[in-house]
């Protein structure tokens, strides 16, 4: 079995890119696909902008994952959580005291010839393309999604009540317990369900907000990772960003 990375396309921009006078930095960070332990690792983190140190927090977790010496599906499922929690707490304690509440989301993938691992906390999203549709593989850790999952309110009722879709219930932080989701899709299941050519996308909420508004482009655009990335970026910038916006698009061939 052999995996070939055939295409990568990405963007990561500050919400105020077109209003430099506001001088707000981009608090998203990303892991551009890199080779690790006979597989490929890539991800996105979104620092919580309501606290000081949001950029530093998102950068730290991405840098930490990038620098893992050994990586395996078993490690991601059973060991990473506690190690990341301890190292993040140590990092925050080493910073200025005003960074004590710095927090971040993190969603990343590791793909090798055993399968696809998805490690996720917060509200970035991982999608996989099936025909001309994007299938969401992660669940948002938000109050909005929690109310939906428990069937307390319908989506229509939540919108009528103007419940925010961005209020997080979980994140990487020094003051709340880290409670991530982990998903594993075996190699053969990936091929059976999605074919020998798979496209995986990771987006921050500033990017998928505009995808949710209209979940389609032309068949040609949906069939091309670079065209899709460019089209979504144009849509965001034409409508006006509401948050920092980040996307990584990948295409792999599974032999």
Protein language model regions, located:
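PP2C/PPM-type serine/threonine phosphatase catalytic domain
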Residues: 1-255
């Amino acid at each position: 079995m052999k995996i070939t990375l055939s295409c990568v396309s990405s963007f990561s921009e500050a919400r105020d890119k077109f209003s430099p006078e506001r001088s707000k930095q981009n608090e998203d960070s990303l892991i551009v696909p890199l080779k690790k332990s006979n597989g490929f690792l890539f991800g996105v983190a979104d620092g919580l902008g309501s606290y000081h140190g949001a950029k530093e927090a998102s950068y730290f977790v991405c840098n930490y994952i990038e620098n893992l010496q050994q990586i395996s599906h078993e490690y991601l499922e059973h060991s990473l959580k506690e190690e990341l929690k301890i190292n993040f707490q140590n990092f925050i304690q080493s910073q200025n005291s005003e960074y004590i509440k710095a927090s971040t989301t993190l969603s990343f993938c590791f793909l090798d010839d055993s399968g696809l691992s998805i490690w996720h906390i917060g509200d970035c999203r991982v999608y996989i393309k099936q025909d001309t549709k994007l299938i969401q593989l992660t669940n948002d850790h938000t109050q909005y999604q929690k109310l939906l999952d428990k069937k307390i309110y319908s989506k229509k009722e939540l919108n009528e009540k103007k419940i925010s879709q961005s209020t997080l219930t979980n994140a990487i932080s020094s003051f709340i317990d880290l409670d991530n989701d982990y998903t594993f899709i075996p190699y053969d299941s990936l091929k059976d369900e999605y074919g020998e050519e798979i496209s995986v996308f990771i987006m921050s909420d500033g990017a998928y907000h505009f995808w949710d508004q209209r979940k389609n482009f032309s068949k040609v655009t949906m069939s091309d990772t670079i065209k899709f990335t460019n089209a979504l970026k144009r849509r965001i910038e034409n409508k006006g960003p509401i948050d920092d916006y980040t996307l990584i698009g990948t295409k792999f061939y599974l032999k």
